[in-house]
Design a protein with these regions (language model features):
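Alpha-helical transmembrane segments and their immediate juxtamembrane cytosolic regions
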Residues: 1-330
Length: 330
């Protein structure tokens, strides 16, 4: 479920904010600040945290062989969850490059209706299915030789980033009719229930996580189709419905939003030890999941909040107080 919509939503929102930020700051300053905000934390955590962890786990006989094994695994042990930041850097650079060489004024895209959303969904399903003829789910490659990428899900991530930029140009989040959002929220929830039903009720060989990870057959079509419906349905529905319901931010939500980036970077280093500590007790998996989820959220956001009190870390994670521009004397 997370792969079907969670990360896609993050790329959609990231794409939404790129055009306005780039235009306000200019391409050079935009890329420079994006490197400071995204690239520097990625490099620091990759080499200061993830690399020692990978070395401790692998215990390689030679460093050269270790580097080769990292490349064969698409650098994933070096990036871990931070591959998302690598993609944001690439997509941001691609946007700036496109704006630089397209030579066209920004275009305002009309708000999509049911037909446009359905056409996008069918196109996403088709492209995803075709790519999975060659690349199965959870098969990773080093994109441009340096960034881990999962081709089976790349169409979703790239297309939603592009749609986010288009949504900003057309002011879709404000002009999207509530009825369209509610309808597609229903579509996304229905497809999600189908995923759960296939996983829980189908025979072992046909459960969702064992349903063809790729190939030409109908199981791959079913999986690609369900993921496409969940992605489009919830991406449209959640954003529109939440905007209708929440007219002013709650203090807790605002505080969490301010530290969400830091919490994302830190959460893996918190979640994995918690999972390992409760792996042995013979208790309900649902209870284990609930305990890990609650503790992970509390500790991740707590650590992100506390990072704002450590000078070097708060600069790295962006959790320091916002800078107030100096007033110019007349």
């Amino acid at each position: 479920m997370n792969a079907a919509v969670g990360l896609g939503l993050l790329f959609l929102l990231a794409g939404y904010f790129v055009p306005q930020t780039c235009e306000r700051k200019g391409p050079r300053r935009f890329l420079r600040e994006r490197w400071t905000r995204i690239g520097v934390p990625l490099v620091v955590f990759a080499f200061a945290a993830n690399l020692p962890i990978a070395l401790a786990v692998e215990q390689p006989a030679s460093f050269g062989g270790f580097v080769g094994s990292l490349y064969d695994d698409a650098w994933r042990p070096l990036y871990l969850h931070l591959w998302f930041l690598g993609h944001l850097m690439l997509y941001s650079a691609a946007y700036v490059t496109w704006r630089r060489f397209s030579g066209r004024a920004p275009h305002s895209w009309p708000t999509p209706g049911h037909r446009s959303i359905l056409a996008f969904t069918l196109g996403l399903v088709g492209v995803t299915w075709v790519i999975r003829w060659w690349y199965s789910v959870d098969e990773w490659v080093p994109l441009l030789w340096v960034v881990p990428a999962e081709p089976a899900r790349l169409p979703q991530y790239v297309s939603l980033f592009v749609l986010g930029a288009m949504a900003y140009r057309g002011d879709w989040l404000r002009t999207m009719p509530s009825g369209v959002g509610r309808t597609w929220l229903g579509v996304g929830l229905a497809a999600s229930l189908c995923m759960v039903a296939v996983q829980m009720l189908a025979p072992d060989s046909s459960r969702y996580n064992q349903l063809a990870n790729g190939g030409l057959g109908w199981p791959s079509v079913v999986r690609s189709g369900l993921e496409g419906l969940v992605c489009a349905g919830l991406a449209v529905g959640v954003l529109v419905v939440v905007q209708d319901l929440v007219h002013r931010p709650l203090r807790l939500v605002s505080a969490m939003a301010a530290t969400s980036y830091a919490a994302y970077i830190l959460h893996v280093y918190i979640v994995v030890p918690i999972q390992a500590s409760i792996a042995e007790p013979d208790v309900s998996p649902f209870l284990k999941f609930s305990v890990v989820a609650v503790l992970a959220v509390l500790l991740s956001f707590g650590a992100a909040h506390l990072s704002g009190r450590v000078p070097g870390i708060r600069r790295l994670l962006g959790t320091g107080p916002p800078r107030v521009p100096e007033a110019t004397s007349s």
